[in-house]
């Protein structure tokens, strides 16, 4: 650190854990501000922005849904997003070390969020592998999901042209199939109430199946060869190869840290916007497109009086922004200390929400075209999730001139949307463990190779003929209630134990002005209520897991709850361990374990007769500090 308080790329003053005696360390920082912004945007903007938000907006009152969505975004989503970015930038460590320094009693929060990210990465990359498989399949003059004369097709298969000729709505009533309260996250959005990732029923009505539906379910997934989660069947080696390619891409993007991933995201984060723009222009030129957009945006303000609409809005906001996975904290820890994290939080949150809104025009312009072509209602083709991007949208693309081109860029968009979100989840784990265990940091390349090898081996279960059942189980339980509980404890630890006043001073020290009263009220009161609201409503509506007509056995649901509980239990388990291993009376132990690491170091130095500026780990230059500004 220079005399003026400037932080160089090579050396960043920062406090360490108790097992480290120095107060500064070598920490890599982003080579440019844009690298950080693109990484955060790439993580937050993922598949759910394309397949989830537009349908929610349509289902919950059209344009009126923007009212509860905007309120939940402002009072719950952005404050939590801002909080986690600020924590990461100020403490300059991954989740485990950060929480160990902030509130030692709640160090288990760090372990919990790392374990949640670990579970999610087991299955999230399978979605990317599906996208890659479709991408490879698109290199043909005739897209394979357009006809019914393939070996995987059944006599009930109907191509799109036959559907149009007979006016049979074989796409099916998707809104019925996907009538859910809280929907699929698939990394940034997770099932909360037993709703189904049903793709086998998509495209199925009155005994008929669309060609696109049979291609996905009978060829890509081969679900017809499995009876359930107890019958995974053989590994599909084409999918296993695609999954391997995905992990190789992830490895060579992350093995050197942010120096490599920060450059890769220039493509993976920006390419989807180019494709969305192209698809938007193309969609608006299709017949019937404005009918779809009308359904998407026409406001029905009576909908906002329904509790489930507000739950949908809150759930979408929370899981779309993605606090609690440790990703925001990890990415921000590589910022320069005086970076304006407040501006970054507002900018990236706005871009994330705007992307979701624009994606709605891309999706519903094509759904309007499908409804117009098939002679059915929008309700009969409007859906979300895998059924939208792997069945409905591909079927529509196949009818356009130059369909191969449209298919290639669409699935490349899905691939890149998934990849940079996967980068974030993996980096959260790597950074947290590297900061807590220095040996891992010194052998990062080997550790990342081992981590992705483990992911691949476990991911093979999702590449089997019954792998979708395993995938669906993880999607339901890996990061639903557990992430909500973890972030609830984050909000409590920061606001009520560490203290919003102290946290505000930390932010003032970084950016020159403290957060205003509004942010403090949100952190202290609104955010915890926001999280409890989502959690309690989800628990009330909980139903055992199903998929189409298949009901998961009791042992599968029990396994799912064990997975969910294994991460959350780290919070009390680590707290109990800390209480038992800390000397002193019970009251003294609580005092020590709720005292931030910096204060403990300050007290230790004062007791040793040493009083020095280094006892308070702040980086503000008093001569250049800015005056407080209320925001």
Curated annotation (Swiss-Prot):
Keywords, ordered alphabetically:
Cell membrane, Disulfide bond, Glycoprotein, Membrane, Metal-binding, Neurotransmitter transport, Sodium, Symport, Transmembrane, Transmembrane helix, Transport
Ranges in the topological domain labelled Cytoplasmic: 1-33, 88-107, 257-259, 335-340, 431-445, 495-524, 572-631
Please tell me where Na(+) 2 binds in this chain.
Answer: 44, 49, 320, 352
Stretches for region Disordered: 1-24
One of the entry's Gene Ontology molecular-function terms is: cocaine binding
Phenotype reported upon loss of the gene: No effect on fertility or longevity but mutants display longer periods of daily activity than controls, reduced rest, enhanced sensitivity to mechanical stimuli when inactive and decreased rest rebound in response to rest deprivation. Impaired aversive olfactory memory due to excessive dopaminergic signaling. RNAi-mediated knockdown in neurons causes significant reduction in the sleep-like rest state with total daily resting periods decreased to about half of that of control flies.
Q: Which InterPro entries match?
A: Na/ntran_symport, SNS_sf
**Glycosylation: which residues?**
141, 164, 173, 182, 188, 193, 224, 300
User: TM segments?
Assistant: 34-59, 64-87, 108-138, 236-256, 260-284, 309-334, 341-364, 405-430, 446-466, 468-494, 525-547, 551-571
Q: Which residues lie on this side of the membrane: Extracellular?
A: 60-63, 139-235, 285-308, 365-404, 467, 548-550
Q: Where does Na(+) 1 bind?
A: 42, 45, 417, 420-421
The record's tissue-specificity note reads:
Expression is restricted to dopaminergic neurons in the central nervous system.
Q: From the record, give the cysteines joined by S-S bonds.
A: 148-157
Q: Ranges of Polar residues compositional bias?
A: 1-13
Name the residue ranges with Basic and acidic residues bias. Answer: 14-24
* A biological process term (GO) from this entry: sodium ion transmembrane transport
Q: Kindly give the PROSITE patterns that the UniProt entry links to this protein.
A: NA_NEUROTRAN_SYMP_1, NA_NEUROTRAN_SYMP_2, NA_NEUROTRAN_SYMP_3
Binding residue positions for substrate:
46, 117, 121
Q: Which GO terms describe its cellular component?
A: axon; neuronal cell body membrane; plasma membrane; presynaptic membrane
Other remarks in the entry:
10-fold less sensitive to cocaine than mammalian dopamine transporter SLC6A3.
The family classification in the record reads: Belongs to the sodium:neurotransmitter symporter (SNF) (TC 2.A.22) family.
Role, per record: Sodium-dependent dopamine transporter which terminates the action of dopamine by its high affinity sodium-dependent reuptake into presynaptic terminals. Also transports tyramine and norepinephrine, shows less efficient transport of octopamine and does not transport serotonin. Plays a role in the regulation of the rest/activity cycle.
Q: What is this protein called?
A: Sodium-dependent dopamine transporter
Source species of the chain: Drosophila melanogaster
């Amino acid at each position: 650190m220079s005399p003026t308080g400037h932080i160089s790329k090579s050396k960043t003053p920062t406090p360490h854990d108790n097992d480290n005696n120095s107060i500064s360390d070598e920490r890599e920082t982003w080579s440019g501000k844009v690298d950080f912004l693109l990484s955060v945007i790439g993580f937050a903007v993922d598949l759910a922005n394309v397949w989830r938000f537009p349908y929610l907006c349509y289902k919950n009152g059209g344009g009126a849904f923007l009212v509860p969505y905007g309120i939940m975004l402002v009072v719950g989503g952005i404050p939590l997003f801002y909080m986690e970015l600020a924590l990461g930038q100020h403490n300059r460590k991954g989740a485990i070390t950060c929480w160990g320094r902030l509130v030692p009693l709640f160090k288990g929060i760090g372990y919990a969020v790392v374990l949640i990210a670990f579970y999610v990465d087991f299955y999230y990359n399978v979605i990317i592998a599906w996208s890659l498989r479709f991408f490879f399949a698109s290199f043909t003059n005739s897209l394979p999901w357009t006809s019914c004369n393939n070996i995987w097709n059944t006599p009930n298969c109907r191509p799109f042209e036959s559907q149009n000729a007979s006016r049979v709505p074989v796409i099916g009533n998707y809104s019925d199939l996907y009538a859910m309260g809280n929907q699929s996250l698939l990394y940034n959005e997770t099932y909360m109430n037993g709703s189904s990732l049903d793709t086998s029923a998509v495209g199925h009505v009155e005994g008929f199946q669309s060609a696109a539906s049979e291609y996905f379910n009978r060829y890509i997934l081969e679900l017809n060869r499995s009876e359930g989660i107890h019958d995974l069947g053989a590994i599909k080696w084409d999918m296993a190869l695609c999954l391997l390619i995905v992990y190789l891409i992830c490895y060579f993007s992350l093995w050197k840290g942010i120096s490599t991933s920060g450059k890769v995201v220039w493509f993976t984060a920006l390419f989807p916007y180019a494709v969305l723009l192209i698809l938007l222009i193309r969609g608006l030129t299709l017949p019937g497109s404005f009918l779809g957009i009308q359904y998407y945006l026409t406001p029905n303000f009576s909908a906002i009086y329904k509790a489930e609409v507000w739950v949908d809005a809150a759930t979408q906001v929370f899981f779309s922004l993605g606090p609690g996975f440790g990703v925001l904290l990890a990415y921000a820890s590589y910022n320069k200390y005086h970076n304006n994290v407040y501006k970054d939080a507002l900018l990236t949150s706005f871009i994330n929400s705007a992307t979701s809104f624009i994606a709605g025009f891309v999706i519903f312009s094509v759904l309007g075209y499908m409804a117009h072509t098939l002679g059915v209602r929008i309700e009969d083709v409007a859906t979300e999730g895998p059924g939208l991007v792997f069945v409905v949208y591909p079927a529509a693309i196949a009818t356009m001139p130059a369909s191969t081109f449209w298919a290639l860029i669409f699935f490349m968009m899905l691939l890149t949307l998934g990849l940079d979100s996967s980068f974030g989840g993996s980096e959260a784990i790597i950074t947290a463990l590297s900061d807590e265990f220095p040996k891992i940091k010194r052998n990062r390349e080997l550790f990342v190779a081992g981590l992705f090898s483990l992911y691949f081996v476990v991911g093979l279960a999702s590449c089997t003929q019954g792998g979708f059942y395993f995938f669906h189980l993880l999607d339901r339980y890996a990061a639903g209630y557990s992430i909500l509980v973890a972030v609830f404890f984050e909000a409590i630890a920061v606001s009520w134990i560490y203290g919003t006043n102290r946290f505000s001073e930390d932010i003032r020290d970084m950016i020159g002005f403290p957060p205003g009263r509004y942010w403090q009220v949100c952190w202290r009161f609104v955010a915890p209520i926001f999280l409890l609201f989502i959690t309690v409503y989800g628990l009330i509506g909980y139903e055992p897991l199903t998929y189409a007509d298949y009901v998961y056995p009791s042992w599968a649901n029990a396994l799912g709850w064990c997975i969910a509980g294994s991460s959350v239990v780290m919070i009390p388990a680590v707290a109990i361990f800390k209480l038992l291993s800390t000397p002193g009376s019970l009251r003294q132990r609580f005092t020590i374990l709720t005292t931030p690491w910096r204060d403990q170091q300050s007290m230790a130095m004062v007791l040793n007769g040493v009083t020095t500026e280094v006892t308070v780990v702040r980086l503000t230059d008093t001569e250049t500090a800015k005056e407080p500004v209320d925001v």
